[in-house]
From Swiss-Prot:
Ranges of residues in domain Lon proteolytic: 597-778
Active site as annotated: 684, 727
Organism name: Bdellovibrio bacteriovorus (strain ATCC 15356 / DSM 50701 / NCIMB 9529 / HD100)
Protein name: Lon protease 2
Record keyword Hydrolase present: yes
Keywords attached to this entry: ATP-binding, Cytoplasm, Hydrolase, Nucleotide-binding, Protease, Serine protease, Stress response
Function noted in UniProt: ATP-dependent serine protease that mediates the selective degradation of mutant and abnormal proteins as well as certain short-lived regulatory proteins. Required for cellular homeostasis and for survival from DNA damage and developmental changes induced by stress. Degrades polypeptides processively to yield small peptide fragments that are 5 to 10 amino acids long. Binds to DNA in a double-stranded, site-specific manner.
UniProt-listed Enzyme Commission number(s): 3.4.21.53
Record InterPro entries: AAA+_ATPase (IPR003593), ATPase_AAA_core (IPR003959), Lon_bac (IPR027543), Lon_bac/euk-typ (IPR004815), Lon_lid (IPR054594), Lon_proteolytic (IPR008269), Lon_Prtase (IPR027065), Lon_prtase_N (IPR003111)
Record's compositionally biased regions (Basic residues): 792-801
Complexes and interactors: Homohexamer. Organized in a ring with a central cavity.
Signal peptide (UniProt feature, chain positions): none
Amino acid sequence: MSFDDKVLEIPQTLPMLPVRDIVVFPYMIIPLFVGRDASIRSVEEALAKNRLIFLASQKDITEENPSPDNIYTVGTVAMIMRMRKLSDGRVKILIQGVAKGRVKNFTKTSPSFEVAVEKIEETPVQKTVVENEALIRTAKEHIERIIALGRPLSPDILLVLDDVSDPGRIADLIASNLGIKVQDAQKVLETSDATERLKLVNEILAAELEVMQTQSKNRTGAKDDMSKSQREYFLREQMKAIKNELGEGDSKSEEMDELREKLVNAGMPTHVEAEALKQLGRLERMHPDASEATMVRTYLDWMADLPWSKKSEDHIDLKRSKEILDEDHYELEKAKDRIMEFLAVRKLKPNLKGPILCFGGPPGVGKTSLGKSIARAMGREYFRIALGGVKDEAEIRGHRRTYVGAMPGKIIQALRQAKTSNPVIVLDEIDKLGSDFRGDPSAAMLEVLDPEQNATFRDNYLNVDFDLSNVLFIATANVLENIPPALRDRMEILNIPGYTENDKLLITKKHLIKRQIEANGITEENIKFTDEGIKYLIAGYTREAGLRNLEREVGSVCRKVAKMVVMEETNFVEVNATTVPELLGPPRFQRDDKIADSQVGVVQGLAWTQAGGEVLTIEALKMKGKGHLALTGQLGDVMKESAHAAMSYARAHQEELGIPEDFFEKYDVHVHLPAGAIPKDGPSAGITLTTALVSLMTGTPVRHDIAMTGEVTLQGRVLPVGGIREKCLAALNLGITNIIIPMACQKDLADIPKVFKDKINFILAENLDEVFAVAFDKSAKGQEKKPAAKKDPKKTKSLAA
């Protein structure tokens, strides 16, 4: 059914039906579903009158109850051809567009819309027939190409277009069938000039055609990729079949695929992944039984297992870190403060290239365990590399793959086992690195420990760069002097001092006893350590700066008690000064007692060893002779030179010191240091040797309650020495509370715990005159002569700290 808009009379007012997501054109036949109450009322009103209704599109399709402002004013007058009510309450109508119309005003808005409508007349065609024909042909070509590209349009539209010659009708027909946007369709509907309307439709068709051509290219490319993938798949399947015929089977192919997947997913840098895949290609072409195939396979396994991009996240909590350090280590405040500073900076700036810390100190003081505590405080993986006895550079940098049994170096091995690229690696005993004809491993360590270079560390085995800049390296050493200067320059040295007897007592009570009781299967109900027993154990059975031997002795006591408990000899043992010898036998070390009274030529000096401080008694004896000096006690060259310097000082100051004029013509001098089996060396016995010689030559006794340390010059000046803390604590353990030290060592007193410093009278000396003024016992009987002292002892320099 069709209507000619020239003979159909359109009333002045019509019910209006707002439609969503569609624009209805004249001559367009389309079914509509009506569900809103107001819209159903409009349909019913139209059916009750002349079946004509005005259709206008909503501007906002989401609006359920549109206002007049939300409805386009230009629409289409349509005839309701058929109506059917549905079971869900909606109405289905079939309408045909009759003519364009414009809303003059709304005569009713409730309960349904009613509008006054004026018909929009078609503007006469202004263009020539040729121009219009060109526009029509262009539109038809666009439609044909759009259909060819797969747009779901009815092919009959081309037949309909062939029967229509009016540009306006063609534009409306295309716009109503193309399914364009509502805004574009409304613009076409509102254009009254037929030629301009067709031009607008052609522009829309051109844009749509361009989009569809792009989609077609994308689909074609995707199909090509799929075809290529399918082709590769079929070729691989054929290759498998051929290999099966050759007896190689599927196992190798599956193994290669699995290895390829591991390499691709390992997170390698681009250039490293390219090298790995290149080696994988070589491996695929090799026969499985070839010797080189095993080498390449091992290499690829290493490449796949390394943590190229895997990192553990830092969890730095300074309060918790402090608790961990205090829990794991007693004292060591300087080292702990530096570690806390490092952690604080790392928390503020996570990407900072931090320093390489080196803990230096005697064995057993906790250097290695400090590294483990740092890893625990940061939440990182921990790994220890023992460098003691390493003499081959390849141990650090790896062997080249040309060698049989080649492997990466210790650094790469550590990273593989840690499974992260940012672990804490402790380089233990870095001072024990050696060198021989195979190279110098300390030179290879230069690159590892340099933050500016280790981002491109190249292991000889891998032959590709590996980034070590995220690794936190911590080194430990016993003797810092054994570390090459260039390597030492790359590290920040933190000296870890030995423990005092009081430290050992507290650590034993807090840690060692509990650990050994648990390790040996007994309980606290079976054993009790008294303070006197622990002190006796420390003094008589250990002589070290650390704690290893002490823990062994505590463990030995616990094992003895465990044996007694199992054999039902007793259920409880109190470990005191009496029971320790019964359990462990006689003491292994006898501590020298301090000198009981003042003697001529006998002086108490102070020495430092790796086991801590020692009180060293120096004895001088004269005998008939010609002024010769004999030295015994296994002295080193430096100590011998100190003795000769002391002898020269005595000769040069013979008169003012009160030495008899004929002493050097009548007597030889013999200086001996007891414990002759132990080598001794160093300059710190200088003032002790000089005091002993002058005491012997003048017959003046030396105070028995005083000890001293310091280097001496020929001019009589007292120079600074090291190990002040350990030396002073050793003297205090023997009950010596008066100690002469060089004035320049006053700064070292800060390292002595206050509880010990308060018990010691420190006498600071700048020259030998000040030493003699304090050291010689002027009240001792039998004193024949007194050395002439130019100056009184400087009371202002004597610190009762």
